[in-house]
C-alpha cells in the first residue's frame, strides 16, 4: 500500500508518501508545496491544487490521509487551512484516491504512542520509524509523513473490519 499524507496549509502544504508492505514502512518521497505570501488567495489555492495533482500523477498513491481540521482561536487561520484542505480533498477525489481523516490525537498515538507528544517528539519518531538520517524539512513535510504513517498502521485494521 502506498499512502499519501497531507498536512494542509495555504502558505505551505506538506506531503509525504510511504509504502507499507508486510509490516515494513519505506519512505517514497516527501516535500512541501509553497505559495508566495503576496499572491491572491484564489491563485494560491489553484497553485496548491495543480502541485498536488502533479504529485498524485507522478507518485501514484493508493490511498491518502488528511488530518481533521482543528479549530483553534484564530478563525481566519482555520478558514484558510480549511480551504487548502478542501483543495486537497478535491484533487484526491478527482484522482479516485480513497481519503481517510484522522484527528491530531490519533496521529500522535499511532506514531509516538502518546497522545500528548509534542512537535519535536513527533518529528523524531517519524525519523526513527522511517530510518532517516535527519528529520524531514520543513515541519509541514514531517507532519504529512506522520499522517501517512498513522494511516499505514491503521488501514489494515480498517480493512479487516470493512471500515475502509
UniProtKB/Swiss-Prot annotation:
<dbReference type="GO" id="GO:0003677">
    <property type="term" value="F:DNA binding"/>
</dbReference>
<dbReference type="InterPro" id="IPR012337">
    <property type="entry name" value="RNaseH-like_sf"/>
</dbReference>
<comment type="function">
    <text>The RuvA-RuvB-RuvC complex processes Holliday junction (HJ) DNA during genetic recombination and DNA repair. Endonuclease that resolves HJ intermediates. Cleaves cruciform DNA by making single-stranded nicks across the HJ at symmetrical positions within the homologous arms, yielding a 5'-phosphate and a 3'-hydroxyl group; requires a central core of homology in the junction. The consensus cleavage sequence is 5'-(A/T)TT(C/G)-3'. Cleavage occurs on the 3'-side of the TT dinucleotide at the point of strand exchange.</text>
</comment>
<dbReference type="GO" id="GO:0048476">
    <property type="term" value="C:Holliday junction resolvase complex"/>
</dbReference>
<feature type="active site">
    <location>
        <position position="140"/>
    </location>
</feature>
<keyword id="KW-0255">Endonuclease</keyword>
<keyword id="KW-0227">DNA damage</keyword>
<feature type="binding site">
    <location>
        <position position="67"/>
    </location>
    <ligand>
        <name>Mg(2+) 2</name>
    </ligand>
</feature>
<keyword id="KW-0233">DNA recombination</keyword>
<feature type="binding site">
    <location>
        <position position="7"/>
    </location>
    <ligand>
        <name>Mg(2+) 1</name>
    </ligand>
</feature>
<dbReference type="InterPro" id="IPR020563">
    <property type="entry name" value="X-over_junc_endoDNase_Mg_BS"/>
</dbReference>
<dbReference type="InterPro" id="IPR002176">
    <property type="entry name" value="X-over_junc_endoDNase_RuvC"/>
</dbReference>
<keyword id="KW-0479">Metal-binding</keyword>
<dbReference type="GO" id="GO:0006310">
    <property type="term" value="P:DNA recombination"/>
</dbReference>
<dbReference type="GO" id="GO:0008821">
    <property type="term" value="F:crossover junction DNA endonuclease activity"/>
</dbReference>
<comment type="similarity">
    <text>Belongs to the RuvC family.</text>
</comment>
<feature type="active site">
    <location>
        <position position="67"/>
    </location>
</feature>
<feature type="binding site">
    <location>
        <position position="140"/>
    </location>
    <ligand>
        <name>Mg(2+) 1</name>
    </ligand>
</feature>
<protein>
    <recommendedName>
        <fullName>Crossover junction endodeoxyribonuclease RuvC</fullName>
        <ecNumber>3.1.21.10</ecNumber>
    </recommendedName>
</protein>
<dbReference type="InterPro" id="IPR036397">
    <property type="entry name" value="RNaseH_sf"/>
</dbReference>
<keyword id="KW-0963">Cytoplasm</keyword>
<keyword id="KW-0460">Magnesium</keyword>
<keyword id="KW-0540">Nuclease</keyword>
<keyword id="KW-0238">DNA-binding</keyword>
<feature type="active site">
    <location>
        <position position="7"/>
    </location>
</feature>
<dbReference type="GO" id="GO:0006281">
    <property type="term" value="P:DNA repair"/>
</dbReference>
<dbReference type="GO" id="GO:0000287">
    <property type="term" value="F:magnesium ion binding"/>
</dbReference>
<keyword id="KW-0234">DNA repair</keyword>
<comment type="subunit">
    <text>Homodimer which binds Holliday junction (HJ) DNA. The HJ becomes 2-fold symmetrical on binding to RuvC with unstacked arms; it has a different conformation from HJ DNA in complex with RuvA. In the full resolvosome a probable DNA-RuvA(4)-RuvB(12)-RuvC(2) complex forms which resolves the HJ.</text>
</comment>
<keyword id="KW-0378">Hydrolase</keyword>
<dbReference type="Pfam" id="PF02075">
    <property type="entry name" value="RuvC"/>
</dbReference>
<dbReference type="GO" id="GO:0005737">
    <property type="term" value="C:cytoplasm"/>
</dbReference>
Amino acid at each position: 500500500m502506498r499512502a499519501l499524507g497531507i498536512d494542509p496549509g495555504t502558505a505551505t502544504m506538506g506531503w509525504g508518501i510511504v509504502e507499507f508492505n508486510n509490516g515494513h514502512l519505506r519512505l517514497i518521497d516527501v516535500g512541501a508545496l509553497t505559495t508566495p505570501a503576496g499572491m491572491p488567495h484564489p491563485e494560491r489555492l489553484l497553485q496548491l491544487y495543480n502541485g498536488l495533482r502533479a504529485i498524485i500523477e507522478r507518485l501514484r498513491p493508493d490511498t491518502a490521509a488528511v488530518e481533521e481540521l482543528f479549530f483553534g482561536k484564530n478563525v481566519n487561520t482555520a478558514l484558510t487551512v480549511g480551504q487548502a484542505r478542501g483543495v486537497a480533498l478535491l484533487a484526491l477525489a478527482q484522482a479516485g484516491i480513497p481519503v481517510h481523516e484522522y484527528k491530531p490525537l490519533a496521529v500522535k498515538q499511532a506514531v509516538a504512542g502518546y497522545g500528548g507528544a509534542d512537535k519535536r517528539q513527533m518529528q523524531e519518531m517519524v525519523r526513527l520509524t522511517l530510518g532517516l538520517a535527519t528529520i524531514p524539512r520543513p515541519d509541514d513535510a514531517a507532519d504529512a509523513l506522520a499522517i501517512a504513517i498513522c494511516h499505514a498502521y491503521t488501514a489494515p485494521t480498517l480493512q479487516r473490519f470493512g471500515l475502509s
